[in-house]
A protein has these predicted regions:
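Short hinge/gating elements
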Residues: 109-114, 176-179
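Conserved catalytic/switch belt of AAA+ P-loop NTPases
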Residues: 231-236
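Acidic/polar active-site rim loop that often engages polyanionic ligands
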Residues: 100-112, 126, 154
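Short amphipathic alpha-helical segments
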Residues: 71-73, 101, 117, 128, ...
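P-loop NTPase Walker
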Residues: 1-108
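Conserved phosphoryl-transfer catalytic core
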Residues: 77-78, 124, 237-250
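Accessory N-terminal region flanking or inserted into the helicase ATPase core
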Residues: 1-28, 33, 37-40, 56-58, ...
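Short gly/pro/ser/thr-enriched loop/turn and capping motifs at secondary-structure boundaries
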Residues: 96, 249-252
């Protein structure tokens, strides 16, 4: 790999960002400022200069297209890189899925490695089935998906209950969790939540299943609460953060 050629392409500001090794580095990059170039250069710098294995990096993007572009640029610069080495390069849900399938002990949660992903419509249909079977009293069924997401958020925060909930929503949420486990299925939300849960259980241990050294994030300004929590899970294990974003394009 010709690292010097990649280095020569960077301007002084980009070089400063690429070589920054602080616990967390946030790079403000507007449209057309060479964001993908900086991300790729950071990955190459860590691998070639700091000798960090590609496997020990997590690269998080919001689309498969963005992840593919980073991989393609990486391969052009380093033809020796293999798909296996970049299996942790992808969307938030995709990376969480890969970690659960290949590196994290999902068996401790009651799942097997061949668990499937439950689509949102399937979860909603299951919820309605449980309501009918268990004769649950649920208000605002037309907003059930949103209410279940809120119940999950409140539960994760450790609160006593869903504010203003005067029905069986919490019972339904518990039954849904049990049924998903019985079917060996996780929702997209479960992927990040369970990956974080398993990494937290290993916090402080000398040998960890994930053992990620760097988290590199594209379009960080678009992260919602769950995605930020996912990033925090890696940092709690000792990983450093390098994030690139455009503050003028904030969605959340």
């Amino acid at each position: 790999m010709d690292w010097e050629r990649e280095w020569e392409r960077l301007n002084p500001y980009q070089r400063e960002a690429v070589t920054d090794e602080n616990k967390a580095c946030l790079v403000s990059a507007n449209v057309g400022s060479g964001k993908t170039t900086v991300l790729t250069a950071k990955i190459l710098y860590l691998h070639e200069v700091k000798h960090v294995s590609y496997r020990d990096m997590v690269v998080l993007t919001f689309t498969n297209k963005a992840a593919s572009e980073i991989r393609e640029r990486l391969v052009r610069a380093d033809p020796s890189v293999t798909p296996e080495e970049t299996e942790n390069f992808g969307t938030f849900h995709g990376v969480a899925l890969g970690l659960l399938k290949k590196r994290l002990p999902v068996e401790t949660l009651g799942y097997t490695k061949d668990f499937m992903v439950m689509e949102p419509d399937e979860e909603l249909e299951l919820a309605h089935t449980l309501i009918a079977e268990k004769k649950l009293k649920i208000k605002y069924k037309n907003r059930l998906r949103k209410r279940l997401a809120e119940a999950e958020r409140v539960s994760a925060a450790g609160d006593a209950g869903v504010a203003g909930s005067q029905d069986d929503l919490e019972i339904l949420a518990g039954l849904l969790t049990e049924e998903k486990l019985r079917r060996n299925k996780m929702t997209f939300s479960d992927l990040m939540k369970n990956a974080c849960l398993l990494m937290a259980k290993e916090e402080g241990e000398e040998e960890r299943s994930a053992d990620i050294q760097w988290v590199i994030v594209d379009e960080v300004q678009d992260c919602d609460g769950k995605q930020l929590e996912f990033i925090d899970c890696f940092m709690a294990e000792g990983a450093k953060l390098f994030a690139v974003g455009d503050p003028n394009q904030v969605i959340y």
